[in-house]
């Protein structure tokens, strides 16, 4: 290179063994014979427009539903990975201030606080007025997307629950129209007991409550036991809501615990047992209020 002197002690580099091109030739505008065509140039974008626009904001929609799982009834996928359900009954103003019995409404969450859905009672005012806590009813449970995934049916059984002829029961359907189990009260002279049955009326678990269910200042626990009642595997707990709330309303909070690997159908039937226990022991009796209204 002209004008460049190598430092002392260094010999100039030998010429390379390959021919050196003095420079890149200018591209031909009109290729001649034997020349490859020159690709067309990409047009410059118009002012204000990007050549490669970035994707716009993603529209926020409803949460994606749970994927179907083999062997799990449609809609019960949310029960697979949880071992605890918290049930909060909403307090109705008409019921609080006037004493009129209305249809119950509930919110369901997992033990971690994740919303699982809502449940709403369906019954007529005549049944609430005349039958009170023993009224026949239907409870619809919907997921956060407002899709009905579980239905509870309670028929009218007259008589006292301490008498074998007046035992209460609840049918559990999932999806609605397909029976997956029953909750059947079993007679005992001192303790409230229930059988958790599958679709074939075979007992798989039992629920045993305390002799005195009106706990003041403490939670009321119903133990979920094995079929032979040899050990406890879960619990249905009616949580104490405070003196003012317990005195003025019948809006209750429940906690349901069960093994994580329990069949989802049995989990759903235990959920139905929780609602049946609420109506049997913690709901106003017939004639408690001056009237009943629809909600």
UniProtKB/Swiss-Prot annotation:
Tissue spec. comment: Expressed in heart, placenta, lung, liver, skeletal muscle, kidney, pancreas, spleen, thymus, prostate, uterus, small intestine and peripheral blood lymphocytes. Not detected in testis, brain and liver.
Domain comment, as recorded: The N-terminal proline-rich domain (PRD) is required for phospholipid scramblase activity.
Region annotation Proline-rich domain (PRD): where it falls in the sequence: 1-57
Membrane topology: Single-pass type II membrane protein
Gene symbol of the encoding locus: PLSCR3
Transmembrane segments: 266-282
Function comment: Catalyzes calcium-induced ATP-independent rapid bidirectional and non-specific movement of the phospholipids (lipid scrambling or lipid flip-flop) between the inner and outer membrane of the mitochondria. Plays an important role in mitochondrial respiratory function, morphology, and apoptotic response. Mediates the translocation of cardiolipin from the mitochondrial inner membrane to outer membrane enhancing t-Bid induced cytochrome c release and apoptosis.
Protein name as it appears in the record: Phospholipid scramblase 3
Motif stretch (SH3-binding 3): 65-70
Localization, UniProt: Mitochondrion membrane; Mitochondrion inner membrane; Nucleus
Biological source species: Homo sapiens (Human)
């Amino acid at each position: 290179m002209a004008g460049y002197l190598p430092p002392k002690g260094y010999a100039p580099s030998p010429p390379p063994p390959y021919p050196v091109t003095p420079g890149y030739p200018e591209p031909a505008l009109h290729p001649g014979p034997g020349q490859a065509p020159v690709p067309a140039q990409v047009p410059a974008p118009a002012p204000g427009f990007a050549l490669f626009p970035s994707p716009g904001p993603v529209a926020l929609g409803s949460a994606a539903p749970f994927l179907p799982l083999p062997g799990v009834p449609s809609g019960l996928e949310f029960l697979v990975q949880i071992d605890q359900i918290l049930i909060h009954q909403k307090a109705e103003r008409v019921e609080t201030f006037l004493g009129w019995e209305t249809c119950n409404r509930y919110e369901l969450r997992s033990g971690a606080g994740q919303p699982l859905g809502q449940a709403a009672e369906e019954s007529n005012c005549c049944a609430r007025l005349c039958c009170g806590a023993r009224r026949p009813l239907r409870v619809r449970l919907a997921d956060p997307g407002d899709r009905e995934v579980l239905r509870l049916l309670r028929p009218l059984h007259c008589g006292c629950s301490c008498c074998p002829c007046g035992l209460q029961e609840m049918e559990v359907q999932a999806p609605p129209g397909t029976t997956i189990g029953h909750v059947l009260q079993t007679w005992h002279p001192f303790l409230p007991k229930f059988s958790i049955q599958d679709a074939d009326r075979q007992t798989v678990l039992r629920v045993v409550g305390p002799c005195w269910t009106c706990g003041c200042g403490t939670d009321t626990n119903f133990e979920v036991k094995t079929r032979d009642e040899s050990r406890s595997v879960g619990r249905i707990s009616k949580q104490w809501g405070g003196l003012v709330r317990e005195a003025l309303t019948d809006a209750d909070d429940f906690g349901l615990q069960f093994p994580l690997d329990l069949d989802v159908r049995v989990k759903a039937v235990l959920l139905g047992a929780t609602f049946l226990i609420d109506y049997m022991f913690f709901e106003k009796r017939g004639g408690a209020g001056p009237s009943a209204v629809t909600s």
